[in-house]
Each structure stands twice: as structure tokens, then as C-alpha cells.
Amino acid sequence: MKRTPLFEKHVGLGAKMVDFAGWEMPLYYTSIFEEVMAVRKSVGMFDVSHMGEFLVKGPEAVSFIDFLITNDFSSLPDGKAIYSVMCNENGGIIDDLVVYKVSPDEALMVVNAANIEKDFNWIKSHSKNFDVEILNISDTTALIAFQGPEAQETLQELVEDSLEEIAYYSFRKSIVAGVEALVSRTGYTGEDGFELMLEAKDAPKVWDALMNLLRKIDGRPAGLGARDVCRLEATYLLYGQDMDESTNPLEVGLSWVVKLDKDFVGKEALLKAKEKVERKLVALELSGKRIARKGYEVLKNGERVGEITSGNFSPTLGKSIALALVSKSVKVGDQLEVAFPGGKLVEALVVKKPFYRGSVRREV
């Protein structure tokens, strides 16, 4: 299994290590519950160095990325980032990603760990007609997420630039704990926070400095378990669970990142799909504390209407919550049932998204 540059730090903190997409990663350090609460009330810190980073350089870098992704990258100012998906020719989602516009001829793409090789090969295969160079810098890049309502105030102690001046989905290159880093106001938790992209060799030093800050405020390191709970509470989608190449962005509530007034791979398929969207992703609150798993059937009046894509117990809400891909006829307020193994049916109410709205900044 692969290890991030912070592996020894996790082991030293007594983390429960697990295999995630071929990476040995911390599931939790003390408990998922405590780590979720730290993110919600103060700060949680995540090692997300398993994510993939691609550097795209050249005079046609912007137009190339604009062709690859469904969102509008061409009009993005320097120093801004954008969330999007990449689709195949059939409109199926290859991956979701964040793209940073560094300059008119340079951009950074951050992709999911399980898709690094697939994405890189797919991106390269579409580059023939563009004057660009594509570098996979994943192995030499570390990524640390510092998330929670006290993130800005706490992190500022170690950052030379003013964090208040970094708007949501903006970034700048700065010095963090004496080390060069790209600091972005982004995250996957539903809280305000920052992600620090830096050279892998510098990661342990920065991690130690951040740990010292956490000890002052009752913050804590957080593992993949807390990350998954936080993202589900905030109703952020997870690739491979809530979406994949068998789903298109219009079905899973991502039509806001699809700009059909520009050209991109999969546009024609999505124009057709827009005429006839048969499924949608909905939020469910289940009765009781049992956790609905991916693939469990969802029923309405005894008839199958879809299936669970993600489920977990929400410590923040004190409820079992889930996302489900269901028939378009299902609406907020509907009473459904989830079929658990053994035939047990558990009641589930369709609720508005998101389940939880935290301190995350809304203005871009």
C-alpha cells in the first residue's frame, strides 16, 4: 500500500490505519464522534495527501481545461478555484475535482485518490490538439485540510498572508510555518477552513506546527471516518458512492456545475439527457440508528424507487442519514422505506438538502 509523507505522524498518534484506494490512511485517532465534533466546534485537521494533483502548463492551459470540465474555467480570474466534474462522451462522470487557476498559462487540478491513474490517462488522451504540458505531481505534493469555525483565527498564527483576504474558493501562495505553500479557502466538511498544498518533504514540519496550534484550542487531527461523516452531513458527494460513470451530473444534483453554453467533452450527451432526467439524488433521515449502506433498496408504498448511495450516523444531528438515487417522482416530505439485509424495512423521510449547514463561507 502507498503511504503519505505523514504516515509516521499518524502511527505516532496511535491512529487506526486502513486501506483506502490503495493508501494506508488514518480512519480515526481517538474516535470518529470526537473528531467530527472538533470539526464542527473548533478545528479538525486532515491529511488528504492521497489526493491527486496535476499541473497543466502552456499557452492553451485554460482553453484545454475548459474543454475537459463541465464548469466555466475560461472566465475564472487568477487566484480562484472552481469545483466541477469531467464527463465521458456519454455524459457519465469520470471524476469530480477542484481546479485552481494559477495564471493564464498554468492551472492545478486536484482529483480523487482512486482515480489518479484513470484521470491522468484520460486527460492526456484529450491533449493532442492543445499546446499544453501535463505533469502528475501527486507523489511530490502533500495536502493538509484545516477545517472548522476556528480555522482562520487559529491558522493565522502560522501564515504570513492575511487569511481574511482569501475569499471562499480563492487561494494564494504564502509561507506557512516557514514553508512555501498554496493556501486555499476550500474544504469537504461544510465548515470554514483551508487546504494547504505543499511539497511532500515539508509536510511533517508543517503538520507538527499545526498540531501545536490544535492543542491550544481543543482541536484535533481527524481521520477519513470523520471526513466521510462531515461531507455527508454537508451533503457533499463522494465519487464511487454517489456518482460514477453510470450517472450524469444532472441526476445527482450537480447541474449547477454544467455550463451548456460552452463546449466540453460529453456536452452533446448531456444536452440530450437534460430533456429526460429520470432519476435524482435525495437526502433521507432514517428512523432509529441503523446505518443504510450503498446498494440498499429504497421503497415507496412497497414499490422499488431507487437505492442508497451513501449512509452514516450523524453525530451532529443525532440521526441516521443517507443519500439515495431515486425516481424523479420522489419529493421532499415523502415517507419511504429502506430495505436492510434480512428483509427489515426502516422508515426514511425525504428532507431538504443539505442535512447540515456549517460555518462554510458562501460568497465565492
Curated annotation (Swiss-Prot):
Catalytic activity: N(6)-[(R)-S(8)-aminomethyldihydrolipoyl]-L-lysyl-[protein] + (6S)-5,6,7,8-tetrahydrofolate = N(6)-[(R)-dihydrolipoyl]-L-lysyl-[protein] + (6R)-5,10-methylene-5,6,7,8-tetrahydrofolate + NH4(+)
One Gene Ontology term from the biological process aspect of the record: glycine decarboxylation via glycine cleavage system
GO molecular function, one term: transaminase activity
Enzyme class: transferase
Superkingdom, taxonomy of origin: Bacteria
A single cellular component GO annotation: glycine cleavage complex
EC number of the protein: 2.1.2.10
Entry keyword set: Aminotransferase, Transferase
Keyword Iron-sulfur: no
Family, as annotated: Belongs to the GcvT family.
Subunit structure, as described in the record: The glycine cleavage system is composed of four proteins: P, T, L and H.
Role played: The glycine cleavage system catalyzes the degradation of glycine.
Protein name as catalogued: Aminomethyltransferase
Lineage of producing organism: Bacteria, Thermotogati, Thermotogota, Thermotogae, Thermotogales
